[in-house]
């Protein structure tokens, strides 16, 4: 593949597609502001509306004056970036170079996604409204499923919407859930339609697995965390020294917890 035939938009789109496929936390966040970023330091203003007042209706009285919408202005800053930069030698056969480029770009997308996941997870850990720790209850006290019910109840008490609640668990917890008959997995799809990417459903949560977690269970709703990402640059170049084609790219992103009550972290202890 010659540098003259490299089409940045095509490879950037392919990179972005593979990037999104590799995300777990990134796929569960609100992505409403993704098209508004282009460079490091860009800011996006997010209006977090206050609750609308609901009043009792009396047909014999006039309606109260309409209230002006109010809320807080939250700033999302694009403050995280990662790049790749690799070479492909001229000596490779033409077809091999195309295959090598495709494989290299897929791997670059995966590595960028891993970097973004760690960044999002760090943001979630910092901004979560509730952080607790404790052992998984004994079997006669509900076991793991009992813990999920406790997390559900905690969110209910904070009036977190029940719609689209997500639960992200470590790999070890997935194994325990699969042995619980109250856990609805893919084989029971006729009973409950699973959200895309979810391994199952329990206690009102769509459940996902992340290899980046070891002893934490994270509950959240998408509106609680905003994530914006942009493959800002995908460039081909010809290094002066050697007979190579070079490809480099830059990924920029920003993440913010905008509704802390919508994020709950339980750290499992022995």
Segments and roles (model prediction):
Residues 2-31, 35-55, 67, 72-78, ...:
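Sequence/fold signature of self-assembling virion shell proteins
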Residues 91-158, 265-270:
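Alpha-helical scaffold segments that mediate packing/assembly in large oligomeric complexes
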Residues 128-198:
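Extended, solvent-exposed, turn-rich assembly/linker loops in the middle of proteins
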């Amino acid at each position: 593949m010659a540098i003259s035939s490299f089409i940045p938009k095509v490879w950037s789109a392919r990179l972005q597609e593979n990037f999104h496929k590799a995300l777990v936390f990134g796929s569960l966040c609100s992505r409403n502001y993704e098209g508004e970023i282009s460079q490091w330091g860009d800011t996006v203003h997010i209006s977090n509306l206050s609750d609308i007042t609901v009043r009792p209706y009396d047909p014999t009285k006039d309606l109260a004056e309409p209230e002006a919408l109010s809320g807080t202005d939250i700033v999302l800053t694009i403050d995280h970036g990662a790049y790749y930069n690799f070479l492909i030698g001229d000596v490779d056969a033409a077809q091999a170079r195309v295959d090598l480029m495709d494989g290299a770009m897929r791997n670059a997308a995966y590595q960028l996604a891993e970097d973004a996941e760690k960044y999002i997870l760090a943001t979630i850990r910092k901004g979560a409204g509730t952080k607790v720790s404790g052992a998984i209850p004994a079997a006669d006290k509900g076991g793991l499923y009992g813990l999920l019910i406790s997390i559900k109840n905690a969110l209910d008490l904070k009036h977190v919407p029940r719609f689209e609640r997500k639960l992200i668990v470590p790999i070890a917890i997935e194994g325990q859930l699969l042995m619980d008959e109250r856990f609805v997995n893919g084989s029971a799809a006729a009973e409950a339609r699973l959200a895309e990417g979810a391994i199952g459903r329990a206690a009102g949560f769509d459940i996902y697995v992340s290899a980046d977690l070891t002893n934490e269970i994270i509950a959240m709703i998408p509106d609680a965390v905003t994530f914006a990402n942009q493959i800002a640059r995908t460039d081909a170049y010809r290094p002066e020294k050697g007979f190579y084609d070079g490809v480099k790219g830059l990924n920029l992103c920003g993440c913010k917890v905008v509704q802390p009550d919508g994020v709950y972290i339980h750290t499992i202890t022995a």
